[in-house]
């Protein structure tokens, strides 16, 4: 795959699972002879939800919940066919969303 890069975007709610998956992808790519740029930590998306504590009265009493989405970006430069095969066979954690662009 001459002159082509693979861009991988990873998303997860837990940053520890995300970092472990990133390390696994980087080690697999380096083992097959490709060079890796990254991982680049992208901004964390924080969604906040505010709900009433009581179902009936007390509008002033509220509770806030938040959901954090952590993201990482990897570029694999000049991947070999072995790199692509190894990445396809890679089994990542269940809570990680992977987007791949060629």
Curated annotation (Swiss-Prot):
Annotated GO MF terms: structural constituent of ribosome; tRNA binding
GO cellular component: ribonucleoprotein complex; ribosome
Key words, A-Z: Ribonucleoprotein, Ribosomal protein
GO annotation terms (biological process): translation
Family according to the record: Belongs to the universal ribosomal protein uS10 family.
Function: Involved in the binding of tRNA to the ribosomes.
HAMAP family associated with the record: Ribosomal_uS10
Complexes and interactors: Part of the 30S ribosomal subunit.
Protein name: Small ribosomal subunit protein uS10
Organism of origin: Rhizobium leguminosarum bv. trifolii (strain WSM2304)
